[in-house]
Amino acid sequence: NNSGDINCKNITCETITITEALGDVELDNITAVTIDVINNSGDINCTNITSNELSIEDDLGNIYLDKVICEENISITNSSGDIDINNIESTDVSIEDDLGNITMIGIDISNGTITNSSGDITIEDGSVETLNVKGDLGDIELYLKGELSDYDYTLETDLGDVEVNEKDEGSKGEVINNSKNLIEVSNDCGDIKLDIK
């Protein structure tokens, strides 16, 4: 579609592929094995999605996900705009944003990779096994479920403070518990906060 909004609702199929040049894309109550969405300029909203693989690319616009279950992986790339994710379950999640905030609330994932060039990264009410977070400019705050002893973690910032469960760790915090769960966070400029309770 070259210009205009795209709305897809109440669809069950094998594959959904959407390419939009200018306009918003909305998916609601979709069940498909593979879902691919590419948008050059406009918001992307996905709610009530069940899939094996979900891929979203946006050059300019906000991305919003709510109530998404993916058996295998979720991949999200945004050049400019916020990424807001609520209530997702997936094995692998990869998120990359060049300019904008990344906010994730109520996530249950096995492996997560999150990269942001400019903007904050926030995870609340998160359940993860392996998490790798990289920020260039912005604060990183992770509020995860469980016990601190359940995780090995390495948190390091070049310019900013590191805080683990409300304890100041300076510019680097590291603990090796020989746990199966691993958190690695690096930041060039900005604070890092890890809270596991």
Name these PLM-found stretches.
Residues 1-8, 16:
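Low-complexity/repetitive intrinsically disordered segments
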Residues 10, 25-38, 44-58, 63-197:
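Short, surface-exposed interaction patches in beta-rich subdomains
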